[in-house]
A protein has these predicted regions:
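Substrate-binding cleft of secreted/luminal carbohydrate-active enzymes
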Residues: 122-128, 368-449
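Compositionally biased alpha-helical segments
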Residues: 20-90
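N-terminal module-boundary/linker segments of secreted carbohydrate-active enzymes
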Residues: 86-170, 178, 389, 426-462
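Alpha-helical scaffolding within the catalytic cores
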Residues: 132-140, 171-174, 244, 316-333, ...
């Protein structure tokens, strides 16, 4: 069920609640502390069919079949503290459609959980340092008493020969990931895909000889697609290493948000300036078409290898709400059929700028979850990132947020505020079988509509305005669900 705390002081509307699923209830809580529970649906019936609010401040309940007789129970709005809806959500995953058509049910369930919370709550996350552990998460727990819900691991050092030697990571030891998952944590994975600096360079057991930076290597992304080229051999050799680990994780029941080839455009979309046209990583250096082909090649290769435990997240870049300075990077998007989540990396952004980014990205990629894939302090200017509550209330309702380590890591005070926020899900609150989350209509997401059975309720005033021109099914589609056969709510 999904709870929506609806302040009637802010909403001058009346609506009809039609039967669709069993177990839906409404609770009206009075200012004197008493409460009354009404069934909206029970065994396919609808005891309460209409709730009315009149101009003189009276709230009335109308019974099914008794509409002609008016309300059977009437309250003065001044006596009401709030009304909460407990609306049931099916927990089955048959309606989840991921980029990977063969995604496991467990993978779909993770996405369903992200989807259920989208616009209502945001998932706390952090990047691992160095990359295959929970040290940063442990620091956050020490500072706040709570673990972030999700830990992100990076395959950045998987190129090192003789993994596990000389103090390097042994990625085939998946216990740092499985232990986290066993404790209730969610998992995300990324890959700083290093390549040799030259064709003749042999990566050292000390980690030397590789880079992601295009100016430091002769590796050409466009040559990856030429069979027999050294770029082609390296690309598939390294993918096979990652596939081996992903298969072990899949066999262990671990599913993950997967974010490869991030920040591809770099400054390629900048219209002018010293860094104009420059990509930050080799995978973006040969342009958008080559980049998209890299993404699609990896996606298809993982499919052929039987990897079906991933939710694919792509990172958009370079719009920054400044169309005079930047072109957007829509040309770099691999395509809806290859992407499940859109991420954005923002450092030192205030709440207003975050909200602007969120809304622009959401408008460009409707139907996709939008996440703050990286965030934190801007180390160059020492500008802190906005607090979660501040950004949320401004309209930046990210699916999840992930601060970076080191000089980018937000302060302990920032983390304390974040982990105590009513909008933030911490590890102890994760429930992949959840069928409801609490959501305040006044503070809830303004852009995704009411969703399936009241899911992801919009701002109360916006609800009143939008429902005059949009059907429930339109909002359900926006939320990413198939429209219901009978709408839960018709606004009059």
């Amino acid at each position: 069920m999904k709870k929506i705390l609806l302040s009637l002081l802010a909403v001058m509307i009346s609506f009809t609640a039609l039967a669709q699923t069993k177990g839906d209830k409404l609770t009206i809580t009075m200012r004197n502390g008493t409460s009354q529970v009404w069934d909206l649906t029970a065994d396919g019936q609808t005891p309460v069919s209409k709730i009315t609010h009149t101009a003189d401040g009276k709230v009335g309940f109308v019974m099914t079949g008794m509409e002609d007789f008016g309300a059977f129970e009437i309250y003065d709005i001044n006596d009401i503290n709030n009304i909460s809806f407990s609306i049931y959500h099916e927990s089955e995953v048959g309606d989840v459609n991921l980029a990977d058509p063969s995604a496991t049910d467990k993978t779909k369930r993770l996405y369903k959980y992200l989807q259920l919370n989208y616009g209502s709550k945001t998932i706390s996350s952090v990047i691992a340092n160095v990359n295959w552990n929970t040290k940063e998460a442990d620091k956050i727990f020490k500072a706040t008493g709570k673990y972030p819900a999700m830990n992100c691991y990076d395959f950045i050092h998987i190129y090192v020969p003789k993994q596990g030697s000389n103090g390097w990571i042994n990625y085939n030891d998946i216990t740092p990931v499985t232990n986290w998952a066993d404790q209730g944590g969610l998992v995300s994975l990324m890959w700083h895909f290093n390549v040799p600096k030259t064709e003749s360079t042999v990566p050292g057991t000390d980690g030397s000889g590789v880079t992601c930076t295009p100016s430091e290597t002769t590796f050409k992304a466009a040559n990856v697609f030429t069979a027999g080229s050294w770029e082609n051999k390296w690309f598939y050799q390294e993918m096979d290493k990652v596939v081996e680990v992903l298969q072990k994780l899949q066999d262990a029941g671990v599913v993950a948000v997967w974010r490869p080839f991030h920040e591809a455009a770099g400054n390629a979309c900048l219209k002018y300036g010293e860094s104009w046209g420059k990509s930050w990583f080799w995978w973006g250096y040969d342009g958008a078409e080559t980049y998209k082909k890299l993404w699609q090649t990896m996606f298809n290769y993982f499919q052929t290898k039987g990897i079906h435990n991933l939710i694919w997240a792509w990172t958009t870049q370079n719009y920054n709400g400044d169309a005079n300075t930047y072109n957007n990077d829509a040309d770099w998007y691999p395509g809806d059929q290859y992407v499940d989540i859109i991420g954005r990396d923002l450092y030192g952004y205030n709440a207003t700028k975050q909200a602007q980014e969120f809304k622009e990205i959401q408008a460009r990629y409707p139907g996709k979850l939008i996440a703050l894939a990286e965030c934190g302090t801007d180390a160059n200017s020492n500008t802190a990132t906005a607090g979660i509550d501040e950004a949320w209330n401004a309209g930046a309702k990210w699916s999840f947020f992930m601060p970076w380590y080191g000089s980018n890591m937000p302060s302990n005070d920032w983390w304390k505020a974040a982990m105590s926020s009513k909008y933030v899900i911490t590890r102890d609150q994760v429930n992949l079988n959840a069928t409801y989350v609490e959501e305040s209509a006044v503070n809830a997401v303004k852009n995704m509509g009411i969703g399936t059975n009241f899911g992801n309720c919009i701002d109360a005033v916006a609800m009143w305005m939008n429902m005059n021109s949009n059907s429930v099914s339109d909002f359900e589609k926006a939320w990413g669900q198939e429209p219901t056969t009978k709408p839960m709510v018709d606004f009059l």
